[in-house]
Amino acid sequence: MTEDIKVKEIETLVTTAKKAQANYENYTQEQVDAIVKNIYQKTLDNAEKLAVSANKETGFGKVSDKIIKNTFASEQVYDSIKDLPTVGVINRRKEDKIIEIGIPLGVVAGLIPSTNPTATVIFKSLIALKTRNAIIFSPHPKALKSILMAAEIIEQAAVEAGAPAGLVQVIQEPTLDATSALMKHTDVSLILATGGKAMVQAAYSSGNPAIGVGPGNVPVLIDATADIAQAIDCVVRSKTFDNGIICASEQALVVDASIKAEVIEQLKAKKAYFMNKDESAKVSKFILRETGALNPDIVGKSASDVAKLVGISVPEETTILISEQSEIGHHNPYSREKLTPILGLFTVDSFEAGVETCKALLVNEGTGHTAVIHTTSDVNAETFGLEMRASRILVNTLGALGAIGATTKLAPSMTLGCGTMGGSSTTDNVTAHHLMNVKRIAYGVE
């Protein structure tokens, strides 16, 4: 298929979406809610099928954890938005004499990564259709079949519940030109960009409004007051969840020297493997390509599989590969984002030094995303939060699942804003609120 034909495909997709959305815009709240409920039910029913497909197609992660992600994206996201008013008058602020009216955006372009393909399609479809929008997905080619499968299930569920056909569509043969044509189309109202840094920057440069997210590089401070057993349990469960593929998973441990011995003991009890200098050097060369980009061959692989790829010998049951480090910089992959079960470990001699190390890690990469602290001191937790240039500061929980709202009360989301500090337009966990325009009728109060 030539690029001209692919661009024509975009025109057809947008025309279809625009027509369907114009019809859908007239639906009542009850009709919209029935459609969204059916999407939730059908995607929940197919959570395992979609997980198997995504794992088989991409080679990333674990089927069992992808089932959990798909279930989260359908069930927890649905529960968080099911009672949200999105049609007509959505709020009456009687004291302020203001009436708020919700209206849809129109056609949304949804960029889908290969790392969390089916869960992200489910999530974006639910919040788009809850707010009476149509959505066109630009899939990562590596996960095309899985994304098509998820979108087909969702489109069928919507139509079955009374929606007009064409609210959920996918670019059938994705290319950079096709994605660019979609993002720049004058009838696209918003780009919801989850993907690599270059793609997110392209979304913001498209001429259309966009909500994009930046890369993570989550530092984890384990301070001297922490419940060490709980902290290490959280770190290992989070970093091994779907083989570390969620961008909010931990990337570097920052440990107070006074508790380092116990931290190492607890990590080894959880089958973490501490690499020597030679092993660390071997793995280091494999983490990054010569261009400085993350090597896709290690993404979403288990620790033992990474070790085999690199040529180092570790026990088969190894959960995480750990390298002790002291330098932070773009040249050092152990101080950068690694979407696989590999961690850098940095030792500090005080809480204040730990805060500074975490700040330096976020400056190096992942500014605006997420930081984690394990502590029993509320004062330390708040101090850490005040100092971190991160949109989510998580306390005593898993990075991967806490940031998306699975183990915290943050809004359940698969799109995590990084604020202007991270090149994004919001620090929020993106949800249905962000896909709705709100008009306000305001009475004079003089």
Describe these PLM feature segments.
Residues 1-99, 127, 269:
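N-terminal Rossmann-like NAD(P)+-binding subdomain of aldehyde/semialdehyde dehydrogenases
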Residues 4-7, 122, 200-329:
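ALDH superfamily catalytic-core signature
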Residues 13-15, 212-214, 243-247, 332-339, ...:
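Short, flexible turn/loop "capping" segments at secondary-structure junctions
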Residues 14, 18-21, 25-28, 36-47, ...:
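Structural signal for hydrophobic packing residues in well-ordered secondary-structure cores
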Residues 25, 312-446:
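Conserved C-terminal structural/oligomerization subdomain of aldehyde/semialdehyde dehydrogenase
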Residues 26-30, 164-167, 243-246, 273-284, ...:
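Flexible, glycine/charged-enriched surface loops at secondary-structure junctions
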Residues 86-230:
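Rossmann-like NAD(P) dinucleotide-binding subdomain of oxidoreductase/dehydrogenase enzymes
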